[in-house]
């Protein structure tokens, strides 16, 4: 799911570039087609190769524009709570997709349409379902955090990657 985060965050980053946008779109197409297959059948060599391809392409998609909100939120989750990086990034991806859906003069909805979704809200629903289908937790309640852990997350909530997100958080 981290591959999908890399691609989407590179696309909607304030520093997005046309070539990176095209790479992000290509990587997302592969992820939506093959991630669930790899999860359900890890021995599927074609699907694994395609996900490796998507990983490289998504890496290129965010290299110039940088990652944004989902990665910013993931770092304290991983550092303090030891949640695996990809799951921590994916935890907020569909939420930020919804927050960002109407920003950037419609380009976010157009991106989702290029992937076959009605709009970014529809794509956010698909991301949520994909996370569920591959066994990832989908909200912080599922981590049974203590009050102290929540306070720690709030205390270190501002990561520089948030400044790459097109909406002030």
Segments predicted by a language model, with ranges:
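C-terminal catalytic subdomain
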Residues: 65-120, 128
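C-terminal charged capping/lid subdomain of soluble metabolic enzymes
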Residues: 108-169
């Amino acid at each position: 799911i981290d591959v999908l985060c890399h691609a989407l965050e590179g696309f909607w980053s304030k520093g997005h570039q046309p070539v990176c946008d095209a790479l992000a779109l290509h990587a997302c197409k592969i992820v939506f087609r093959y991630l669930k297959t790899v999860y359900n059948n890890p021995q599927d060599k074609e699907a694994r190769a395609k996900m490796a391809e998507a990983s490289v392409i998504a890496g290129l998609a965010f290299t110039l524009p940088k990652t944004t909100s989902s990665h910013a939120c993931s770092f304290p989750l991983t550092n303090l709570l030891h949640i695996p990086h990809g799951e921590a990034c994916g935890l907020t991806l569909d939420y930020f997709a919804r927050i960002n859906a109407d920003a950037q003069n419609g380009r976010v909805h157009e991106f989702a349409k290029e992937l076959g979704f009605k709009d970014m809200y529809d794509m956010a629903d698909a991301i949520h379902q994909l996370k569920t289908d591959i066994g990832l937790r989908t909200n912080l309640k599922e981590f049974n955090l203590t009050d102290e852990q929540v306070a720690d997350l709030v205390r270190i909530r501002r990561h520089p990657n948030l400044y790459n997100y097109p909406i002030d958080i």
